[in-house]
Amino acid sequence: MLEDPLENVLNVVAHCLPMEQAVAVWDSALNKNLIDYPRLQRLPFNGVASQVLANVSRFADSGLESFVRLRLAWLKLRIVPQAWVLGHRVDYLIGDRLILLIDGSQHEGKQRRLDNAHDFELRQRGYEIIRVGYVEVMFDWPAVQLKIMQAIGLGMHLKKR
């Protein structure tokens, strides 16, 4: 059986998939520790692969998070992926107190109950929460972006004085 090295696969992915999808695949390889960022930096990628490399992050827990990170990059605000807030990781902390949570397609049961309890605690402590799901991110991004922009416009990302 022949196997192509992961580096070659990632290069092909960069050239064959749209940017968001390619970045999500590369993010996943980093997140799963299949390769590390210094190794990627040493490889002679060019063209679109070097653009993908410039956009990767090992902090994306899912492809959805990769898509969202890329779609929010233009905001030029402090956006912290996988931030620890009140003892739990949140998908994104925007500014000082706006939290963006992204639920995958299988978000239910015990995990959902735990998330609801954490949401309540976050709100009690002055954080603002936007929770979106798979369908919204993948098929209704303009509505998600509008929610985020409205929250920022209202200053919900800033510390209360």
Summary of predicted features, one role per range:
Residues 30-161:
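Surface segments flanking catalytic/ligand-binding clefts of nucleic-acid enzymes
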Residues 1-34:
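Hydrophobic alpha-helical segments and helix pairs
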